[in-house]
Amino acid sequence: ASIITSPVYSMQITGLLKNFIDHMSYNFHRPRFFYKKVLIITTTAGAGHKEAANYLKEVMYYWDVDYVLTMPIAYRDIQLNDKNRAIINRKADKFALELNSRKVHEPSFKSILMYNVWRAMSINGNGVGIADCKYWSNEKLKETNFYPGIPIGFVKRTFGKFIFSRFHKK
């Protein structure tokens, strides 16, 4: 599990965190965090905390993180008020329950779509990098409609096969 936190500057995450995301951007097309759980905390004395948290949540989504919980907090005083304390306690309890459950969630249709587009493009060699082709050359990844060991129902498995067939050149 990870906790990602950022104060809000100019209605967005910090430049340092953005640089980290840019540095790790290969995870958008070589996902590997299928079993990870992430808590995102954004803070501000003004506005933009929800938007910044949602941006980070979207990044984690494309990296195929199993579970993401956001905790955007706006406070205008030196001390946290009771409302913010209640939010923090509620979200912390929810995240703790998720961690203790050890549950692996079924991926969304969007995750299955992106997984199979990248899988097909890499197997085809469609202008993707050498590292992408090497990642997707793993036999287990080549043969599955989503990462091995992740639960996926019949409808989503069929959807994954369809998407792969549309993008894969035989």
Annotate each PLM feature:
Residues 1-66, 148:
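Helix-loop-strand module that forms the ligand-binding subsite of alpha/beta enzymes
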Residues 18, 57, 75, 96-98:
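Alpha-helical membrane-embedding segments
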Residues 42, 51, 67, 87, ...:
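Generic detector of bulky aromatic hydrophobic side chains
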Residues 65-74:
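Short beta-strand elements in bilobed, periplasmic/extracellular small-molecule ligand-binding domains
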Residues 76-80:
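A short acidic, helix-capping loop that chelates divalent metal ions and anchors anionic groups
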Residues 81-85:
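N-terminal beta-loop-helix "entrance" segment that forms/cooperates
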Residues 86-170:
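C-terminal and late-domain segments of enzyme folds
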